[in-house]
Every structure is written in C-alpha cells, then in structure tokens.
Regions:
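GH16 jelly-roll
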Residues: 1-140
Length: 140
C-alpha cells in the first residue's frame, strides 16, 4: 500500500518538476562539475551536458558541482545491477558537506542490493541544519 502511494507521490513530483524545468539553463558538465573518483567509470555523453556513471567490481564513480546552488533541477535515470547484489548500495545524493563539514544538509536516494531473487530496496534520508543525528529516514 505504502509502496504505491510513494510511487504516485514520486511520479507527481517528477511530472511537476519536469514541466517547470523546461526553461532552466543547462550547464555543460565540464563547466559545472568535477570528477570526485572513478574517472574510468564516468563518461561524458555527446551532448556534453549528461554523463553516464557506472559501477564495476572495484569502484563506482562520482562528481561534484564547482559552484553552490540554492535551488535547481536534477534528474537521474538509474539502472540497477541484476543478480546477487547484497552489500551493494547505489546512491544519488546531494550534500553541502564539503562546505559545512560539521553542520551540513543532505538528501539521499539509496538503492540497497539484496540476495538473488529478492527485490532492491529504496531508502531515502533527509538531514537539515546539520541534524545528521536526527534526520528523516524511510525504507521501502
């Protein structure tokens, strides 16, 4: 029951944000972002504005914005690994922890792997005003 409500809510937000985002400028990846780790697993696509990041046996990949943003639009198309994925966490998150190490804000979308035959689980975390001890965590 809650899974369906969550998916309807998420879909509604995506549709709303998608409609509002059509007039926003898009920054080229090289102009607005820097690689954090896993350079071999990060490929800039032909349009120069999108990237394909991947996960192999040793590492994933990540990048960070070169500027601060007070608001904006973001999206991700995530394909999760198949088969046995226990211990694998695929995450899409935003944080200002590089600027505020002891008092940061964070929004996480984490996909938690599982044993063969079991579904992936999604976990969301929201921390505000440095409340890393008292955040909002939901698991579906």
């Amino acid at each position: 029951k809650y899974h369906v409500l969550f998916l309807i809510y998420l879909f509604s937000i995506i549709v709303l944000v998608n409609g509002l985002s059509r007039n926003l400028p898009i920054v080229a990846f090289d102009e607005g972002y820097s690689h954090l780790f896993g350079d071999n697993n990060l490929m800039i696509l032909k349009d120069g504005k999108s990237v394909h990041i991947s996960l192999d046996e040793r590492t994933g990949s990540g990048f960070v914005s070169q500027d601060l943003y007070l608001h904006g639009y973001f999206s991700a198309s995530i394909k999760l690994p198949a088969d046995y994925t226990a211990g694998v966490v695929v995450a899409f998150y935003m944080s200002n922890g590089d600027m505020f190490e002891k008092n940061h804000d964070e929004i996480d979308f984490e996909f938690l792997g599982n044993i063969r035959g079991k579904d992936w689980r999604i976990q969301t975390n929201i921390y505000g005003n440095g409340s890393t001890n008292v955040g909002r965590e939901e698991r579906y």
